[in-house]
């Protein structure tokens, strides 16, 4: 009974984190992230209701750079749209934190989760707190002189969310999945190594994807596989190792492409390793990996070719998390065998 409760709690928490990540991506893609110019963790749980309160929020927004530089002249109705998207993202974050924290306190005092097992849950709790501050720290970067948030802060904001999800999902499968029974003579060293490498390259690629989103780097060089008839664009050939390139949309898109190739190659090798073992469950994971990889690659290419359509770009982000989840599951099963 207790194990079932923890499983349901972790499952709901994971779903909520994914939903918050996806809505956060949509918020960025629609340029809605700077519409709420204050951080009110408690009193900000309710949106404006009256016409006067909407006018007051709109007046606050007009005092900041984004209105004057990017959205000058937008109507109140247009402002409501971007405001509500950012509001939903913040509200989801608060609800997700509560869904995680309140049951965690209950489980701890009822001794449902033992002291020896608490460390990952405490780390996730700490990261939830950090994430709230990181979200505002990111937004604040676009409320000063520039009407754009720092792409680096955006990337760290996303990565913290993914790490939280990773911890919760790992605890979920640890609580839910049975140990994999494989003959002792089976060599699992190679698939274990490549599952670890795959997790690493997917993390790096998610981080790079956030940099692309933060710099609107998906709106340039909308061709594939070449960038304006060249594998390496002319703008970065002569100064490829210059640290300033990390603020250059051309360089960031190029590195994200390289990351995509790396993810594809590593996951394909992992799939081959899993299929060679000829174990039903690992073979099933291999097929899931094929589907997730195909979806991730195809949505990434379509996102680029069609200048970042919001729905496809959001699906692309979602499948990055799904792909990571399958690899984590794979790694857990191999380690547990």
Swiss-Prot record:
Q: GO terms for molecular function, please?
A: metal ion binding; oxidoreductase activity, acting on NAD(P)H, heme protein as acceptor
Mark the transmembrane ranges: 6-26, 87-107, 119-139, 154-174, 192-212, 258-278, 285-305, 308-328
The UniProt record gives the binding positions of heme as 256, 316
Its record classes its membrane topology as:
Multi-pass membrane protein
Where is it chiefly localized? membrane
Main EC class the enzyme belongs to: oxidoreductase
Cofactor(s) for this UniProt protein:
heme b
> Any idea of its EC number?
1.17.99.9
Keyword tags: Cell membrane, Heme biosynthesis, Iron, Membrane, Metal-binding, Oxidoreductase, Transmembrane, Transmembrane helix
Cite the InterPro entries for this sequence: COX15/CtaA_fam, HemeA_Synthase_type2
**Annotated compartments:** Cell membrane
Tell me the protein family, please: Belongs to the COX15/CtaA family. Type 2 subfamily.
> What is this protein's function per UniProt?
Catalyzes the conversion of heme O to heme A by two successive hydroxylations of the methyl group at C8. The first hydroxylation forms heme I, the second hydroxylation results in an unstable dihydroxymethyl group, which spontaneously dehydrates, resulting in the formyl group of heme A.
Assembly: Interacts with CtaB.
Annotated protein name in UniProt: Heme A synthase
């Amino acid at each position: 009974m207790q194990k079932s409760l923890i499983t349901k709690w972790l499952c709901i928490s994971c779903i909520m984190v994914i939903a918050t990540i996806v809505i956060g991506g949509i918020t960025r893609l629609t340029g809605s992230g700077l519409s709420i110019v204050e951080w009110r963790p408690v009193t900000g749980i309710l949106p404006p209701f009256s016409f006067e309160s909407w006018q007051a929020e709109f007046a606050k927004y007009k005092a900041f750079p984004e209105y004057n530089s990017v959205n000058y002249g937008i109507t109140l109705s247009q402002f409501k749209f971007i405001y509500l998207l950012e509001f939903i993202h913040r509200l989801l974050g608060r609800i997700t934190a509560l869904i995680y924290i309140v049951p965690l306190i209950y489980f701890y005092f009822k001794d449902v989760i033992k002291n020896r097992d608490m460390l990952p849950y405490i780390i996730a709790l700490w990261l939830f707190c950090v994430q709230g501050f990181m979200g505002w720290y990111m937004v604040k970067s676009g409320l000063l002189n520039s009407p754009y948030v720092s792409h680096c802060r955006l990337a760290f904001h996303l990565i913290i969310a993914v790490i939280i999800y990773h911890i919760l999902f790992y605890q979920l499968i640890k609580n839910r999945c049975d140990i994999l029974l494989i003959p002792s003579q089976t060599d699992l060293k190679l698939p274990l190594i490549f599952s670890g490498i795959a997790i690493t390259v997917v993390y790096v690629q998610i981080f790079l994807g956030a940099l692309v989103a933060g710099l609107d780097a998906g709106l340039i060089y909308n061709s594939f596989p070449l960038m304006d008839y060249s594998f390496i664009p002319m703008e970065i050939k002569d100064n490829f190792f210059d640290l300033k390139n990390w603020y250059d949309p051309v360089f960031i898109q190029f590195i994200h492409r390289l990351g995509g190739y790396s993810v594809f190659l590593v996951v394909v090798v992992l799939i081959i390793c899993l299929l060679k073992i000829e174990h039903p469950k690992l073979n099933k994971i291999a097929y899931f990996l094929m589907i997730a990889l195909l979806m991730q690659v195809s949505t990434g290419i379509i996102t680029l070719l069609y200048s970042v359509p919001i729905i496809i770009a959001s699906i692309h982000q979602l499948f990055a998390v799904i792909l990571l989840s399958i690899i984590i599951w794979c790694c857990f099963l191999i380690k547990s065998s």
